[in-house]
């Protein structure tokens, strides 16, 4: 089920842990020739400064062959590329996969 929130965010529930979901997405990206540029462990970084945060990780990924033509058409799109997917656990222990809606990005950057 896709849940669109205000601001163009799409939330999809995951039946797996944050780490399992990250690994599944990494495998999908790799199988499709998409580069994973970074994996940000927000909860791990919070722990380093003595703060507690539920498991929260951000994947930053993309494909120059797909993204470059879009940025040539709408240079402001570089603000939102490479793409990002947030995987987090909520206060109830439910894991969510969140990303910016493609329709939101199209509208935001004036793409046809």
Regions found by a protein language model. Name each.
Residues 1-2, 96-98:
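Short, compositionally biased low-complexity segments
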Residues 107-112:
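Well-ordered alpha/beta subsegment
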Residues 30-83, 87:
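Compact, glycine-rich, soluble single-domain proteins
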């Amino acid at each position: 089920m896709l849940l669109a929130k205000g601001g163009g965010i799409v939330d999809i529930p995951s039946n797996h842990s944050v780490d399992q979901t990250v690994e599944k997405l990494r495998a999908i990206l790799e199988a499709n020739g998409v580069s994973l540029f970074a994996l940000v462990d927000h909860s791990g970084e919070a722990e380093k400064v003595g703060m507690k945060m539920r498991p929260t990780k951000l994947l930053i990924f993309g494909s120059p062959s797909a993204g470059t033509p879009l940025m040539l058409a709408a240079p402001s799109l570089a603000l939102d590329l490479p793409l990002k997917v947030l995987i987090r656990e909520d206060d109830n222990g439910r894991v969510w996969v969140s990303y910016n809606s493609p329709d939101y990005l199209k509208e935001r950057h004036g793409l046809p």
